[in-house]
Regions:
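Cofactor-binding loop segments of dinucleotide-utilizing enzymes, especially the Rossmann-like FAD-
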Residues: 8-10, 39, 107-108
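N-terminal beta-loop-helix "entrance" segment that forms/cooperates
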Residues: 36-56, 145-151
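Helix-loop-strand module that forms the ligand-binding subsite of alpha/beta enzymes
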Residues: 52, 56-129
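Glycine-rich phosphate/pyrophosphate-binding loop and the adjoining helix
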Residues: 134-197
């Protein structure tokens, strides 16, 4: 399984990027492969001018196409997700997220900015073909801090919600045959134990 993380902030010390890195660590601990992509990986000129046919845009689309799941993080500015993230999403094909599990992650100044996920980001993800968008993780600036050394401090409540979301994402990526086999094995075990099934 291939998972792509897409950071919608140009700052390495961004709170939303800190949450994204923590989610990636949790997924790596489960043995899942992670590929990271940020705004700095696409030339600013390509983003500003929308160079859809350029080599960076082709590479971006190839990385998204290869992913089974995409985690997208963004800071919320002026009640919407970041313009840099929108510029990246504009370089994708119309159905670039079709068949992929998508987990949105955002941070903002107040709880009121949570609506930016539902009414700002999710409609754009849907327009890109995403049909399996997990409930997003939102945190306020007070709940996620990045110190001068770049070390992230995430409140327990946010950490728990992020871990739950990562668990749901991992469940969605688990091969369906594994679930069927486990159910089959439980049925055989019940029969062997003399239980009627």
């Amino acid at each position: 399984m291939s998972i792509l993380t897409l950071a919608g902030s140009p700052s390495q010390r961004s709170r939303s990027s800190a949450l994204l890195r923590h989610a990636a660590q949790l997924l790596r601990a489960r043995g899942l492969g992670i590929s990271e992509l940020g705004l700095r990986d696409v030339p600013a000129e390509d983003l500003v001018e929308g160079h859809y046919a350029g080599p960076a845009a082709h590479a971006l689309r190839a990385r998204v196409a290869a992913a089974d799941a995409v985690l997208i993080s963004t800071p919320v500015y002026k009640a919407s997700f970041s313009g840099g993230l929108k510029a990246v999403l504009d370089l994708l094909d119309d159905k670039a997220l079709a068949g992929k599990v998508v987990l949105p992650i955002a941070t903002g100044g107040s709880p009121a900015h949570l609506l930016a996920l539902e009414y700002g980001l999710k409609p754009v993800l849907s327009a890109l073909g995403a049909r399996h968008i997990l409930a997003g993780v939102y945190a306020t600036d007070k709940q996620v801090r990045v110190d001068d050394d770049g070390v992230s401090h995430i409140d327990d409540d946010v950490r728990t919600r992020l871990e739950d979301s990562v668990e749901r994402l991992a469940e969605q990526l688990r091969p369906r045959g594994v679930v069927v086999n486990e159910a089959f094995d439980l049925g055989r075990l019940a029969l062997a134990g003399g239980f009627s099934v």
